[in-house]
Regions:
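N-terminal lobe of the biotin/lipoate ligase/transferase fold
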Residues: 1-113
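Short amphipathic alpha-helical segments
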Residues: 26, 68, 114-122, 226-230
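Short loop segments at secondary-structure junctions
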Residues: 64, 107-109, 158, 182-185
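Contiguous, small/hydrophobic- and glycine-enriched helical/loop subdomains that border
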Residues: 99-143
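Long, positively charged amphipathic alpha-helical accessory segments at protein N-termini or as interdomain linkers
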Residues: 133-135, 170-276
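Beta-rich nucleic-acid/ligand-interaction surfaces
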Residues: 139-159
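Aromatic/basic-lined ligand-recognition segments
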Residues: 157-165, 173
Length: 276
């Protein structure tokens, strides 16, 4: 299996100092474009991508198929949310200035069909970034949390991070949301409100039964440093892998931006199918 740190260079794109305010698909298109480049060229260095958005709700594909998904999305948009359906798995996740999105994009051999090692790399990167607080962190599905999954990350039983994965034939993008600041309960209430509208009329509970009190932010869990501190600790965690040089970027390079434009068009087409 390809290890993210086995390359001579790791690209770090960190735009957390300037949260996105427009289309939330834009940062996802950067991940998608880089993954496509990795699929074509196994010599591409791994990319670690950190970003934030001012106000958005990112949905999973199953969310988009709920009976009143279109109505729920329109309601969110009227309240000032950017909305999108992402390529990776998972379910609805709210984005805000206190939420850091962390992606790990790398080449992967076509025979590496087991997704777990890639999830583990993300888990260990976050654990290292939390320092001694990482010793308190546990992975495993948190009942009642939004966007539930086998690699939920929690401290004291409260989820602060969820991880999803997007697979291409020869590349992988592991994407995490990390509630660094803000109220986990409020984030949970936003998701619960979406499902109350989107799931009207369904008798099958094929969507997360969200209990907002099962969510928290790192700040609420006693982890200091805020967004800037978390981003800095991710960089420190990368630097701990002495065999890799870190190429740091605080804005998208032109060569990637051009590729991302094509990926964005494809993602927009997918999003036109919401509710169908």
């Amino acid at each position: 299996m390809q290890n993210a740190w086995s390359k001579n260079t790791v690209q770090l794109l960190d735009t957390t100092s300037r949260p996105y305010t427009g289309e939330v698909l834009v940062p996802f298109s950067l991940d998608e474009a880089y993954a496509r480049l990795c699929a074509k060229d196994p010599a591409m260095p791994s990319l670690v991508h950190l970003w934030r958005h001012e106000r958005a709700m990112v949905l999973g594909s199953r969310d988009a198929k709920l009976p009143h998904a279109v109505e729920a999305i329109r309601e969110l948009q009227m309240r000032g949310y950017e909305t999108a359906v992402r390529q990776s798995g998972g379910a609805a996740v709210p984005l805000a200035p206190g939420v850091v999105n962390l992606s790990l994009v790398m080449p992967a051999r076509a025979v590496d069909l087991n997704p777990e090692p890639f999830f583990v790399q993300m888990v260990e990167l976050i654990r290292a970034a939390l320092g001694t607080d990482g010793e308190r962190m546990h992975s495993g599905e948190v009942a009642g949390a939004y966007c539930p999954g086998s690699y939920d990350l929690a401290i004291d039983g409260l989820k602060f991070c969820g991880i999803a994965q997007r697979r291409l034939t020869r590349a992988v993008a592991v994407q995490a949301f990390v509630n660094v600041e803000g109220s986990g309960r409020e984030y949970g209430e936003q998701v619960s409100s979406f499902y109350r509208v989107a799931a009207q009329g369904t008798t099958v509970h094929n969507y997360p039964q969200v209990q907002p009190e099962r969510m928290a932010s790192l700040a609420e869990l006693g982890v200091s440093g805020g967004v800037s501190g978390f981003a800095a600790r991710i960089r420190e965690g990368l630097n701990a892998h002495k065999e890799s040089a870190i190429a740091v970027m605080d804005s998208c390079p032109p060569w990637l931006e051009a590729e991302a434009g094509n990926a964005l068009d494809a993602l927009k087409v997918r999003n036109l199918l919401v509710g169908s």
